UniProtKB/Swiss-Prot annotation:
Lineage: Viruses, Monodnaviria, Loebvirae, Hofneiviricota, Faserviricetes
UniProt KW Transmembrane keyword: yes
Pfam family, one: TMEMspv1-c74-12
Membrane topology: Single-pass membrane protein
Organism the protein comes from: Spiroplasma virus SpV1-R8A2 B
Name of the protein in its database record: Uncharacterized protein ORF12
Amino acid sequence: MPTWLTTIFSVVIVLAIFLYFGLLIYQKIRQIRGKKKDKKEIERKESNK
């Protein structure tokens, strides 16, 4: 295999790993934000009673 091919493959693999971890972190942040919103909605419902 030529060297430029191996460099392209390695760059693609590194980018894929970064994207994978980025998506995982992004989903966790969204879940945390969603939970905070749920808590606020529950507090509003309780205060309305």
